[in-house]
Amino acid sequence: TEAGELVLVIHSGSRQLGSDVATYYVDQAYRYQCKKQRKRARQSYYDDADAAGFIRQKSSQNSVQVKRETAVLEGSLLEKYLHDLDIVVSFADLNRQTIAKLICDHMGLTVTDRFSCIHNYIDTEYMILRKGAISARLGERVIIPLNMRDGALLGVGKGNPDWNFSAPHGAGRACSRTEAKYAFTVEEFK
């Protein structure tokens, strides 16, 4: 900082746990929606049990399709998902704390202040999905990573409701990780 303090930024997530939880619940949502549509198709047959109704029901039952990527969770499945997301967020925070402790212990540094700024998550308290964004409530401390050269911005949230009390997570990348893997070498980076 300008005051000569060292700032350690740990940019790490849940180490695959979040992705695994998301994959599990996408599958649960898909199964739930398929079951719900099959039940609805059977019910329409019983409600309209004449021959034409039977034909319509069979036709609609065969055309019932649920897209995996748009299947939604409801009720207790949604509650379980949100609960598990909170666990993933806590796990990711503990992961960052552990990394920071190991680094500071190794370097003989004393931590005088610490805060966590989470991105790409669902704020379950306010039910706000933040993809590429962070919480920036009034007075809340934020960090916005820029790039490896320029570091990160440390700031304070403005609490703007027009922006869902959010701020951008970062400046974005010039290229994807996969592209960078093939475009650059470690020697070039050094």
What is the role of each PLM region?
Residues 1-190:
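Domain-length cofactor-binding catalytic modules of enzymes
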